[in-house]
């Protein structure tokens, strides 16, 4: 799991995702993502990295989805979509409780440090919940 901050330009999220996948994937893997990642370029580059993209299909009359039928028919695709909903809850927590909906800091470096701190706080909460469940 990685957490990185970038500028909001419409392409940076996908570029960072591919960069992180290239650094961390050493065997066949899958990646789940929302509709914003359903582009031919992103899907093709994921396949080059031997990563199966489980991206929510962007259904629109003028544009076809970059995800083909052999991916969506697989039972792992439906499971990934379910897990993605749980992950979206984490993003909601980071934005609301963690305070990262709008940054208070100037500069990418300071914002990145704040994001790491919020991520660490969330992980500590998860550990506390797991310990409570184990007892």
Regions found by a protein language model. Give the residues of each.
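Acidic/polar loop patches that form or flank catalytic/metal-binding clefts of enzymes
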Residues: 28-32, 52-55, 130-133
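Hydrophobic side chains within alpha-helical segments
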Residues: 16, 89-92, 126
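A short, flexible helix-boundary coil/loop motif
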Residues: 97, 101-102, 125-135
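Short, intrinsically disordered/low-complexity patches at protein termini
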Residues: 24-26, 115-116, 126-128
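Helix-centered, glycine/charged polyanion-binding patches within enzymatic domains
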Residues: 35-109, 116
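Generic hydrophobic alpha-helical membrane-segment signal
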Residues: 1, 22, 76, 111-114
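Polybasic low-complexity intrinsically disordered regions
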Residues: 1-45, 119
């Amino acid at each position: 799991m990685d957490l990185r901050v970038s500028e909001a330009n419409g392409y940076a999220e996908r570029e960072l995702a591919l960069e992180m996948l290239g650094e961390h994937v050493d065997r066949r893997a899958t990646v789940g993502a929302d509709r914003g990642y359903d582009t031919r370029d992103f899907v093709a580059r994921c396949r080059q990295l031997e990563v199966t993209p489980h991206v929510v299909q962007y259904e629109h009359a003028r544009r076809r989805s970059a995800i083909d039928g052999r991916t969506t028919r697989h039972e792992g695709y439906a499971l990934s979509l379910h897990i993605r909903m749980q992950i979206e809850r984490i993003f909601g927590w980071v934005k609301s409780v963690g305070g990262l909906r709008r940054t208070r800091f100037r500069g990418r470096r300071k914002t990145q440090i704040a994001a790491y701190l919020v991520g660490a706080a969330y992980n500590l909460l998860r550990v506390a919940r797991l310990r409570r469940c184990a007892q």
